[in-house]
Amino acid sequence: MGSTNTNMTERRMLLPFQAVANFFKEPSGPKCPECVSVIIDDACPNLDCPLKVTEWITRWCSPEALNIPGLGQPEAEQLAKLGLVLHPGELYGLSPGDWARIEGVSADQLDEIQRQMEDSKSPKPSALLHGLRLPGVSANMAKRLIEEIGSIDSLQETKPNRFQEIDGIDEAMAFEVYRWFRDSVNKQALKMLDQIGFNFTD
């Protein structure tokens, strides 16, 4: 009897430790091919995943968005993997030393990139919105959102039920767009872009 009680006591003492071990156990499931974080809701949750950052910078520089042709996917990939940028707002604060770390970019090319970046600061609202890479928001949907809501500032205050009233936006997408504006990294990007001089009010 005494031995049984001892075993039960030992098992009870182990329970809290087992709970802690389970809490810190690495989650299972498919992993991001770039940063090997476990995929959640069909997306990599890692905010500084180089693949996610590369895709965002590439979208930002595309002709349908901010039109910075000198910054293509190879350059965006290097910027992301070197940890020089987390979002497009940080592109505009890179130092000459940062750019010097990007292979394959000559001094003349860098001058052209910086000219293109300066020209990019007065985009159409829909092009700016498309460049922000909201989930499910294509170039056409960006135009529709601006037509319906009015400005990026207004979009930040829009509730999911209002998004659902727009043709082509279902409940899931409405929530994702709403949630995008409340993400800490996205809010940081918007704040930095606003400080640079991008217009979110028109």
Describe each model-derived feature in a short phrase.
Residues 9, 14-202:
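Accessory alpha-helical DNA-binding modules that contact the DNA backbone or grooves
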Residues 1-2:
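OB-fold and OB-like beta-barrel modules that bind single-stranded nucleic acids
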